[in-house]
Structure formats: structure tokens, C-alpha cells
């Protein structure tokens, strides 16, 4: 055991990145401590239960078959999964026209986007052949240059920039958009359900995996409710000042989102490129709401519960009903400007606005849920946004090379630093394992 307060490695953050890093460090025989600001583990994953046992995932919740890192954890811990309900027709509100599939105009644009994304090297997006051009150009400008219809432009803004990046097309570059798509293998692997990113859910909620990961570490490894305020560091180690005391380590893995990592005080200050990466990677803006009903009435109407819309505040809905659940759940998402609009309303008005659109999509029964549950990740002190952070235009080519690079004794892990499935659980696990490997190599060298 290490002497009090000194470890081979301290991990800041107990989300999937931090817990994955801790497991690799412990497996390598390194003394390890995990410091978590929240009173729980899981980071941007949070599962709650209603009084009757209905499961609600308030944060991240889905896994897909090509997400091999998180799938390995599901198998390791014997966590049960179930397919996302998907029988029935999808609704696409396309400029006021009610469709049951993706319009051909959009399918063609998706193919063009996929072809461009294949030109982006996911480990080094700044080295793409047209990186400088694509990083200067916003996705909104690219859409405008396509000469597509107004409704198609609106669809791409809401479904790609909103549904994938939790922002607006005017806020993100073409390069950031293409990198994110390339990291998952294409547009459809990101947007789809069966066989894609939204394929599977976890019995007991996504937080159950994080809980089991934490419990599987040596007793006392994870220290909750103790945010790191300051890190004094040099090439040989670091002193971490927390709300409750201090710790020393030969190496530190900062496994929190860029926005939060940038709020820690560093002495000496971080290099300009590293600090610049923090400042140019704001968190996304999304609002996720759950409407709980006595039964999944939409299924009787031949609907899957999946909807995408170019109008109203809601961009997407999904049937989020767990198996054997006493009640049914429709979950809806607002992104970017629409999410900000909703946040400005009081809870009663938000409820009215959301239910009105659900009623337009699914009929009058959607207007009267038993319960209406929302969770605002922007208001969470130790999150400050969702789904994940993304570079603003110019960020990748100016600061991308610094995103994962260690700074002396400091290493970086979070889904935003992942090469594959960036923004997802899987990317978080990848990043934690990569940072732990860096620490292991540094301490054995």
C-alpha cells in the first residue's frame, strides 16, 4: 500500500473514462486513487426509477454492436441488455409533410457526407486533405452551398448538427462534423436503431455498468464528493488540492469533459495550445424529456415511437419503454437553439410546449401523460452540458494535436478525446484505457 496520500496515479473523474483508466492502472499493479466531484459514479450517465419501478435513463443510455469497448464491459459484468423497441413506422415531419422514412433528397446528402467523412483520418483530423478548408467552413455554410431545399437544410441542421452534436450547424465546422461521423463509421450507424448506435439498452439502466465497475475496484479506490480544485505539477509528479484535502501522485489522468478540465487551476499554467483546446470545445446543448403513459398506445397505431421533425422544438422522439415495465415511456429531445428556448421557459410552459408537439406527432393521448420528467445537464455543476464537447470552427487545425497530448505528469481522458465512437460510452472507455497505457509506459520507462 502507498503511504498516506501518495499514489502512482490519481484519476480525476469517475465516469466511464475515469473508471476504465482506474481498472487498467490497478491491473498493471499501480497504486491508484479516483477522485470524483459528484456523490455518485457514472459522469454523464444517470439512471432513476419512478415509484412503480419504471426505469428512466436521464443521460446516455444506448449501445451499438460495433461499440466493442462498452460491449466487452457489458459481458464482463454480466449486465443484461434488451433491444430498443422498434416495430412499426417512423414518423418524419418534413416541412409539414408526414413521411414514414428518410426522404430521397436527404439520403443523397447523407451519401455525400459519408464520402467526405471517409477522407478524415480519425486519429489526426487536422491532417485531412482539406482540413484547413473544412475547419474554416461552418456546416451551415456547407449546407447552403449544396443548393438543397429549405426543408432539407433544416433537416440536416436539426438531425446532424442537433441530433449528433447537440448544437447548430452555424456553430460547428465541416471538419468537426465529418470527424464525428467518421469516428462512428458513417451517418446511419449514428442515427439508426437496429444494428446501429441506438440498438440496445441496459436492464437496470446505463449507470449500472458504472456502479459495477466502481464496486470491482479495490475498496477505497473511489473517493466521492471531492472535486479537484488545483493541480501543482512538474515532470516528476503532481499535488492535487481538493475540496476535502490533498493528494500526491506520480501521474494524473484528468478524465472529465474539456469544459470542466479547463476550470481546474493548474500551476504552472498549461501550455497555450492545451489551454486553447479547452476554451474552444464547449459542451453541447440538449434537453431530454420523458413522458410516461399507462401503455404504449402508439404501437396500436402501427408506430414505432421514433419521430424526426423539422418543425417545433423537438427534433427526435423514441419509444423508451423498458421490457416488463409497468408503464410506457416516450422520450423526446430538443437540441441547440430549441433546447435553449425551452430552458428559458418555466417548467409548466416547457411541459405544455413539449406535449403539444407530441400530440401533433402521436395523437391526443400523448397530451395526457401520467408523469413528465426532465433533467437539465446544463444546470449540473459537474457537467455543464451534453451530450459532449465539440471544437468550434478552426479548433481542430489550430489545437487538435494538443487534445490528447500529455503535459508532463498530466494525461487526458474523456469521450471527447476518443478516436472511435467519440461522444459515446465506447469512446470514453477507449480514452481511459489509452491514458492508462500512457501512464504505465511513463512509469515503467
Predicted regions and their residues:
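Conserved flavin/dinucleotide-binding core of flavoenzymes
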Residues: 2-3, 8, 17-20, 28, ...
